[in-house]
């Protein structure tokens, strides 16, 4: 026989589980797959999803030239979260024509988080999280210049990418521009009409360090 003389209320302390959106794989406790764009063929790296789909469990839903929607372990649309420089992007979840509207220009690496710890990023990250890490500022005292030119014979198109970055004292800066001009896609039966596309983009940033 069990009896209880007094009613006792036990209140447990609240537990809060958080994770910063700007935390990269080097500081994370999560299982993360990482792709460094330094090791990717520039032709493949032209389109972000072409590169990310090389990672295990990641594929691309493609409905036409330049359109690629991420799919992680079969889940996509509003089941995949994309974070660029700590900011959630809300431009690819809806229709199948809404691809990942991010160029690989100026991107240093991409990290993909999969598994049950997606709950740290919210219920809409059930498929996983794609974290995009931009190229780092340089600590060199002078300006650094790089250029990449690509010719696509199938589209009879060109891509020109120019980057400038440098540092002076505690101040660092970066600038990158890219221009893409592709014609209609060529198939064995001839050109496919209305598959041409153009893209112009500009990225810039400035950083000031209080200690250096």
PLM regions with names:
Residues 49-88, 108:
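Extracytoplasmic beta-strand/coil segments of soluble accessory domains associated
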Residues 71, 87-116:
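Short acidic/polar hinge/loop motifs at secondary-structure boundaries
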Residues 102-146:
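A beta-strand signature from Gram-negative outer-membrane beta-barrel systems
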Residues 14, 69, 109, 129, ...:
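Membrane-embedded beta-strand positions in outer-membrane beta-barrel channels/transporters
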Residues 12-41:
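N-terminal periplasmic "start-of-domain" segments of outer-membrane beta-barrel proteins
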Residues 131, 139-142, 163-212:
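Periplasmic-side early beta-strands and strand-to-turn transitions of outer-membrane beta-barrels
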Residues 43, 47, 67, 97, ...:
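Transmembrane beta-barrel architecture of outer-membrane proteins
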